[in-house]
Curated annotation (Swiss-Prot):
One of its GO terms (cellular component) is transcription factor TFIIIC complex. InterPro entries: TF_IIIC_su-5_HTH, TF_IIIC_Tfc1/Sfc1, Tfc1/Sfc1_N, TFIIIC_tauA_Sfc1. GO terms for biological process: transcription initiation at RNA polymerase III promoter. Residues 7-21, 115-126, 140-158, 199-210, 401-411, 508-521, 677-696 have a biased composition (Low complexity). Involved in RNA polymerase III-mediated transcription. Integral, tightly associated component of the DNA-binding TFIIIC2 subcomplex that directly binds tRNA and virus-associated RNA promoters. Residues 800-820, 839-865 have a biased composition (Acidic residues). It is found in: Nucleus. Disulfide bonds: none annotated. This is General transcription factor 3C polypeptide 5.
Length: 865
């Protein structure tokens, strides 16, 4: 068996050697001989790619500058250029530049096989001899052979001719002329008179009569001297000042022009037509007075592949079947809760619904084909634009509300009061700390004396009383509890320090453990209500007295939304005190009776359960869950027609609903969209006072200030007197904030406001005329001349015409307005406006001032609340 295997292997090796020697390769059903494997040479040659057909190598090297220039470019480590001039004798010739670039090439030498050529020449000679010996034909053929044909036949390889190729060397780098040739400027000579220098040198047939004379340049003038037999004036030769380079660009720029992939070729016009719209289409919008869209938009191309997008579309279809009109915020909330994506809703929603731009369903998405202007039951889906001020908002944020400007006047007073209260609390805490530290020192001294006596007794009676340590521990526990009851009002840090001092004094381990347990039960602790909550607050709860203390950085206890936790949490002070013995453990992993097993992430709740925040101001009536307000909107009568502003409700019922919401939740924005056009005169002149928050609590009659008012000057106009009284009254009211009481808001308040506003309009016109007349009097009065006024026209004032020369140097002085005389001007103005004089109308003005003061005081009281 071994002999047979050895024979087979030897046969296989012989066949392989034969195949290698005369192996054929099949490529496209054509057999080729295998190439012989040969080693690479070690020599290195450098190449020069000449950009022309080289017939004479010597001239080609001279045009480059010689071998020295080539070797310098190859040997240089820096980037150098090799200049190539196609016309080296012409000074105006612009060179092209070549650079050295690394390559990995092989230099081949290809030669024809000499043995084969010799055999072919012998056969050709024999054939020619046979032709010579053969008889000549009767018809002579024309001579077709010539030198050119013979040369071509010699140059062209024969069919059966073979060549030998050998690798001579490696080419590691070559010089290439990849750059562009510069613009070539050729000087043209004048055929009549002038010629170039090269032409003059080579021209042997020039006439002897005319001689060329060089140009002579003088200082003042430049001209050509004439020296010829014909006395012809010779022309100036051109300067021919050529720049060294015409073009700054050496290498061409590869623009890579490509056809637009979105373009389509039109055979009729034979042009490329581009897509008109490459981006996503906009969503469908509709106005209240326009026709609603019915046709859906096309779904994106990814819809057929993306399953999540299909799922979100199915969710949206189910939501629009339940409810045909949705706000975008509430729609996103529902989609997210059911497992959809927000990014997909934006792309899929235009294929199912359209958006209302204005009207009672502003910023709502309505199902395609559904017209809410026809169906009266869509009144419950109408939107309400509702905001509250920052002071009434239970969830403060950094974004400003629209009516912040109305409350800027009294913010400083509220902040100052809060600072004063915090300072008082800090002082009280410091005093309590000092007192308690003194008491602790006294207690420590007494404890040390008692302990020293007890230790001596225990050392004597260790063998007799084995249970003495336990009794001692119980006594220490009782003493520490009493000390903790004394310091209930201390902060956490004070309690910890006291306990540490007592633990250091007691040297036994059992006492330390008992002390730590007592500390947990008796000392106040910090609890954090809802980690991650936006209104996160720290509450310090005392375990003994049941009092709740607020971190001074947080001034209010905020209610926690119940939807953020699985169980309701105590928010009031009474509920916190009831559970004081066992602190609230609301964090994940807590323990205890009131502990929360797990924390549920807060989810956006779009319903109108509590006062709206400043972030969202649009709500649908169906989302209002306040029972009193929901019952009102359900009981409102619906009109027969749908209006643009109030929808299916009347103006009175809509405004009444807003007033109810205002009384329940806060202040309505003064820049709301729904304003009546009937009271245009009052709406334009209303000040910020009328839009301030009004509380619904009953008010008691106001206590007037006891300070006397300053007497009004007789001759001073009313405008300035009223302003002065207002400032004085405001100062008195600010000093006596405690004297401001509450008053009722009756239904007659609206009528009184309109009357007051009309009075303000009349007085504003009156004050404007008085101010203008006073300005005129200041500039036109004389020094001692009386005032003259005519309402219908005429003299308004006059100058003091004194002829005294001494008065010329005096400065211009204004006359006194009224020197205790009767006020003629005020009487005439009162007669013109149909009012009383200044003295007779003091009582009416004082009453009006008191009414304005009452409004201002009410506003300040409400802000303080």
């Amino acid at each position: 068996m071994n002999d047979e295997t050895n024979k087979n292997n030897s046969n296989i090796n012989n066949n392989n050697n034969n195949n290698n020697s005369s192996a054929l390769v099949l490529v496209d059903n054509v057999r080729y001989d295998k190439a012989i494997i040969r080693p690479l040479p070690t020599k290195a040659y450098y190449g020069l790619e000449y950009p022309a057909n080289v017939q004479n190598a010597d001239k080609a090297i001279e045009s480059v500058g010689g071998l020295s220039k080539i070797s310098n470019v190859i040997k240089s480590r820096e980037k150098e250029y090799l200049q190539l001039k196609f016309r080296p004798n012409n000074p105006t010739c612009k060179p092209t530049f070549g650079t050295k670039s690394p390559t990995c090439h092989l230099l081949l030498r290809v030669r024809p096989n000499k043995q084969q050529t010799q055999t072919q020449t012998q056969t050709q000679t024999q054939d020619n001899n046979e032709e010579m010996n053969s008889p000549k034909p009767t018809i002579q053929s024309p001579k077709t052979t010539s030198r050119s044909k013979q040369q071509q036949q010699q140059q062209q390889p024969q069919e059966n001719e073979k060549f030998d190729a050998t690798i001579i060397a490696l080419v590691p780098s070559t010089i290439r002329f990849d750059g562009l040739c510069d613009f070539q400027y050729l000087i043209k000579s004048d055929n009549n008179n002038t010629k170039s220098e090269s032409d003059n040198v080579n021209d042997s047939s020039s006439s002897s009569s005319s001689k060329t004379v060089p140009i002579t340049k003088q200082k003042d003038q430049y001209y050509v001297q004439q020296y010829s037999d014909n006395n012809e004036i010779m022309k100036d030769e051109p300067m021919n000042l050529i720049p060294p380079l015409f073009s700054r660009i050496d290498f061409p720029q590869n623009y890579l022009f490509k056809a637009n992939p979105n373009a389509q070729f039109d055979k009729t016009s034979k042009q490329f037509v581009f897509a008109k719209q490459t981006t996503r289409k906009a969503t469908g919008h509709a106005k209240f007075n326009n026709v609603i869209p019915v046709a859906p938009q096309e779904l994106p191309k990814v819809f057929g592949v993306n399953e999540l997008m299909k799922k979100t579309r199915d969710i949206l279809v189910a939501l629009f079947e339940k409810r045909p009109i949705w706000l975008y915020i509430s729609l996103l909330d529902k989609v997210q809760k059911e497992g959809g994506l927000v990014a997909h809703t934006k792309r899929v929603l235009p294929s199912l619904a359209f958006n209302f731009v204005d009207g009672p369903w502003r910023k709502c998405w309505v199902k395609l084909g559904f017209d809410p202007r026809i169906h009266p039951e869509t009144s419950q889906y109408q939107t309400i634009d509702f905001r509250i001020s920052e002071q009434d908002n239970h969830y403060p944020s950094n974004q400003p509300s629209k009516n912040n400007n109305n409350n800027n006047n009294n913010k400083d007073s509220i902040k100052n009061k809060e600072k004063d209260n915090s300072n008082k609390e800090d002082k009280e805490h410091k005093e309590d700390k000092e007192d308690k530290q003194e008491e602790d020192k006294e207690n420590n001294e007494t404890d040390n004396n008692e302990k020293s006596n007890k230790i001596d007794e225990e050392s004597r009676d260790n063998t007799k009383n084995t249970d003495g340590g336990e009794d001692k521990n119980n006594k220490n526990i009782v003493e520490k509890k009493n000390n903790n009851e004394k310091g209930d009002d201390n902060n956490i840090d004070d309690g910890d320090e006291i306990m540490k001092n007592k633990e250091d004094e007691n040297g036994e381990g059992n006492n330390n453990n008992n002390n730590n347990n007592n500390n947990k039960e008796g000392v106040s602790e910090v609890q954090k209500l809802g980690r991650g909550h936006k209104d996160e607050k720290l509450i310090i709860q005392n375990g003994v007295s049941g009092e709740t203390k607020i971190n001074p950085s947080r001034k209010k206890l905020l209610d926690i939304n119940t939807f953020e936790f699985n169980s309701q949490l105590p928010t009031s002070s009474s509920s916190l005190s009831s559970s004081s013995t066992q602190p609230l453990l609301l964090l994940k992993g807590g323990s205890g009776d009131d502990a929360q097993d797990f924390y549920q992430a807060p989810v956006y709740d779009y319903t109108f359960k509590t006062a709206p925040s400043m972030l969202s101001n649009l709500y649908q009536i169906i989302d209002i869950e306040e029972p009193s307000i929901a019952e009102y909107w359900a009981s409102v009568k619906i009109q027969s027609t749908c209006q643009k502003k109030f929808g299916w409700f009347s103006e009175s019922s809509f405004r009444e609903g807003l007033e109810r919401m205002k009384a329940r939740f806060g202040v309505m924005d003064n820049k709301m969209r729904f304003k009546s056009r009937s009271n245009t005169s009052t709406a334009t002149t209303t000040s910020t006072k009328s839009t301030q928050p009004k509380s619904t609590q009953p008010k008691e009659p106001k206590l007037k200030s006891t300070q006397p008012k300053e007497p009004r000057p007789k001759g001073r106009p009313r405008k300035y007197a009223i302003k002065k009284d207002k400032n004085n009254n405001n100062n008195v009211d600010n000093n006596n904030d405690d004297s401001i009481d509450k008053m009722d808001l009756d239904d007659e308040e609206t009528t009184t406001k309109s009357n007051k506003q009309n009075k303000e309009i009349d007085e504003s016109l009156k004050n404007d005329t008085l101010a203008q007349m006073e300005k005129d009097n200041e500039y036109l009065h004389g020094k001692n001349e009386e005032i003259e006024i005519e309402i219908d026209g005429g003299v308004v004032g006059g100058f003091d015409y004194d002829d005294d020369d001494d008065d010329e140097d005096k400065p211009f002085e204004l006359l006194d307005d009224f020197d205790g005389t009767d006020n003629i001007q005020m009487k005439q103005i009162d007669d013109f406006f149909g009012t009383q004089t200044n003295e007779d109308s003091e009582e009416d003005e004082s009453d009006f001032d008191e009414e304005e003061e009452e409004e201002e005081e009410d506003f300040e009281f409400e802000e303080s609340e």
